[in-house]
Amino acid sequence: MSADLLGPSGLPYRPCAGVVLINPVGLVFAGQRIDNPGPAWQMPQGGIDRGESPREAALRELVEETGVTPDLVDVLAETPGWVTYDLPPELLGKVWKGRYGGQKQKWFAMRFLGEDSAVRIATEHPEFERWQWMRAADLIDGIVPFKRDVYARVLSDFREILA
């Protein structure tokens, strides 16, 4: 997967895949980041490895961050294109070894078919300190500011599924 699109910083975007995990009553999984001093919530997401499709990366990230395995989800939809965000200036050069100026993301809506007990955030490399099911409309306020537009667009893309 190439990171060929450049952001305003002149640095390429890091290819990433994300998951909007939806429970049977229409609430969305949100994890509170373990590495952020404030209450920063986000949905499962992460980089796409070389040779990996965005869908494969999304399913891998779901397992790595939540313990939810592919047999416990039904993939419902994919964002029609890449969604991008730029890192704020204070983070440029500090994350991802300074190689990227933001992310280009493909998002997947997935229906969670399991029980809440299948969610295990105490993974090998934990990213979340706690998790909850949230209304999509409430999720955006808890996201770090530089990702809010991405989340709003993704949730809008999946609005019919979330309704």
From Swiss-Prot:
Segments forming domain Nudix hydrolase: 12-156
Q: Which cofactor does it need?
A: a divalent metal cation
**What Enzyme Commission number(s) appear in the record?**
3.6.1.-
Q: Which organism is it from?
A: Paracoccus denitrificans (strain Pd 1222)
For whether the record's keyword set contains Hydrolase, the answer is: yes
Chain positions of motif Nudix box: 46-67
- Residues that span the membrane, as ranges: none
Q: What does this protein do?
A: Accelerates the degradation of transcripts by removing pyrophosphate from the 5'-end of triphosphorylated RNA, leading to a more labile monophosphorylated state that can stimulate subsequent ribonuclease cleavage.
Q: Which SUPFAM superfamilies match?
A: Nudix (SSF55811)
According to its UniProt entry, one GO biological process term is: nucleoside phosphate metabolic process
Q: From what superkingdom does this record's organism come?
A: Bacteria
Family, per entry: Belongs to the Nudix hydrolase family. RppH subfamily.
Q: Does the keyword Hydrolase apply?
A: yes
Xref: InterPro entries: Nudix_hydrolase, NUDIX_hydrolase-like_dom_sf, NUDIX_hydrolase_CS, NUDIX_hydrolase_dom, RppH
Q: Which GO terms describe its molecular function?
A: bis(5'-adenosyl)-pentaphosphatase activity; guanosine-3',5'-bis(diphosphate) 3'-diphosphatase activity
Q: Which keywords are on file for this protein?
A: Hydrolase
PANTHER family per UniProt: NUDIX HYDROLASE 26, CHLOROPLASTIC (PTHR11839:SF22), UDP/ADP-SUGAR PYROPHOSPHATASE (PTHR11839)
Protein name, entry field: RNA pyrophosphohydrolase
